[in-house]
Amino acid sequence: VQRHARARARSTWRGDDRERPLQQVGRSQAFDLVPVLAAYDVRRLATSPAVRCLETLTPYAETIGADLELVEEVTEEAATEGAVTKVVTGLVEDLHTTRRGAVLCTHRPVLPLVFEALGLDDPALAPGEMVVVHLRKGRVVATERHLPH
């Protein structure tokens, strides 16, 4: 579960919030994710279609030659408890079937719904921070928190 990297401040952005890009430090955070995601053999890259989320996962996607899976249900505008739970449940089922790692990149206001769907307390991730969730038979057995660099 990935919170997008550091983006430009809302207060200084004049356009559509979905188009708000990463700051330079956020772009560095995105590149720093490449070896971390590779260590977990992440192959499914699900993300909010907001530019800041896309830019967070693009360096890794390009490294492994994978496409980003755009998930409207995890945008700030569209997220509901039911929709997010359905997305998370689908990812967990896919992980159980494929045995391949996945990442879900989203926004601070959506993260509590993601963690609730996993049966976890919201750890209040900082920009660029992630929680690796280890599953066994579809149940959470351990978590690891990775701070941004």
Predicted regions mapped to residue ranges:
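Active-site-adjacent alpha-helix immediately C-terminal to a catalytic or transition-state-stabilizing loop
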Residues: T89-A142
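Flexible, D/E/H-enriched segments
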Residues: A142-H149
